[in-house]
Structures are given as structure tokens and as C-alpha cells.
């Protein structure tokens, strides 16, 4: 039977085979274990969309910087429980639930009390889930998720030569005259 997948397996597929456009392999809203009948077209299209680099994401500032730079999106696997099954997530403990992979794709206009943006997360469960398939995660929740022992989080980019710089947003702000 099916045993699911891993973030590392998805990254390997994205770097070697590529990821097809959704129009070539549509998601029906239900789990399908068989390849579509147009498999050779899927492979040809996927080869045009390979990931060039994967960077481990370990901090909220790293997530914020990566998404804010427009380099790509973040593939994250977490322990999925009821606390994250909502349109706005403010905290995370990792209790109760199995593993689930989702994508962090953009900074939100919603800010926490420190002025840090929430992160937009896209789920695979369709538009009937959350806020039309999306959820906003607070900086606090993201930090808690990244510290959880079962979390795997990688920034994925089609840019092959980009290297992330190590710095904190607070340190950068000190050097700027804002």
C-alpha cells in the first residue's frame, strides 16, 4: 500500500524530473496513486520546470527573507493537528495528528504586534478549505513549527547560483536609516 511521501523525496523529484504545470496533471481533490494517461507529456513539461537549489529553512527571519526576495517558495512538512486546520494560525504545538506537506508562498499584509508579516500557506485540500485553500500563519506559529522535531522545511528556487546570506532583519535595520 501507499506509505505517503517525504519532503526530501519531493525535492529529489523536483530537481531531477521537474514539476509539471497543473494543466498537465490536474488535481481532482482526491488522492490518486496512478499516473495520468498523458504521462509522457507530463514528463516533457516537468523537465522545463526543475528546481535549481534547495535551502533548509530554520528561522522565521530566513522564511521571511526568502519569500520576500522572490526566489521561490517553501516546501514544509509538519505534524498536522487541529490547531493548524484553520484560516489563521497563531500558535503551534505539533500535538495530535499525522504528517502533512504544504507550501509557504508569500508574505501576508497581516502583521503581528511587532510588525512582522504573517506567512501565506497553501494547502492541497482545495478552495473549500481555510480561506479559499489558503491560511495565514503568524511569525510565532512559524517559529514554533520550525523548532518542532518533526518539521522539515526547504526553500526551493529555480535559480541555480543564488546563495542565501546569513543575517537577521533587526541587524539589517540597524544599518539602514529608516
Report residues per predicted region.
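Predominantly the structural core of cysteine protease catalytic domains
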Residues: 1-122, 127-178
Amino acid at each position: 500500500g501507499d506509505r505517503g511521501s517525504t519532503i526530501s523525496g519531493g525535492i529529489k523529484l523536483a530537481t531531477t524530473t521537474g514539476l509539471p504545470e497543473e494543466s498537465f496533471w490536474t488535481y481532482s481533490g482526491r488522492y490518486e496513486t496512478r499516473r495520468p494517461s498523458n504521462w509522457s507529456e507530463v514528463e516533457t513539461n516537468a523537465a522545463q520546470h526543475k528546481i535549481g537549489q534547495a535551502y533548509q529553512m530554520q528561522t522565521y527571519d530566513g522564511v521571511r527573507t526568502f519569500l520576500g526576495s522572490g526566489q521561490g517558495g517553501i516546501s514544509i512538512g509538519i505534524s498536522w493537528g487541529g490547531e493548524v486546520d484553520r484560516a489563521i494560525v497563531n500558535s503551534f504545538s505539533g500535538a495530535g495528528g499525522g504528517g502533512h506537506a504544504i507550501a509557504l508562498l508569500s508574505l501576508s499584509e497581516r502583521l503581528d504586534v511587532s510588525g512582522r508579516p504573517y506567512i501565506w500557506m497553501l494547502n492541497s485540500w482545495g478552495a473549500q478549505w481555510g480561506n479559499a485553500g489558503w491560511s495565514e500563519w503568524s511569525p510565532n506559529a512559524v517559529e514554533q513549527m520550525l523548532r518542532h522535531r518533526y518539521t522539515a522545511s526547504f526553500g526551493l528556487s529555480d535559480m541555480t547560483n543564488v546563495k542565501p546570506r546569513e543575517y537577521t532583519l533587526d541587524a539589517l535595520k540597524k544599518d539602514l536609516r529608516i
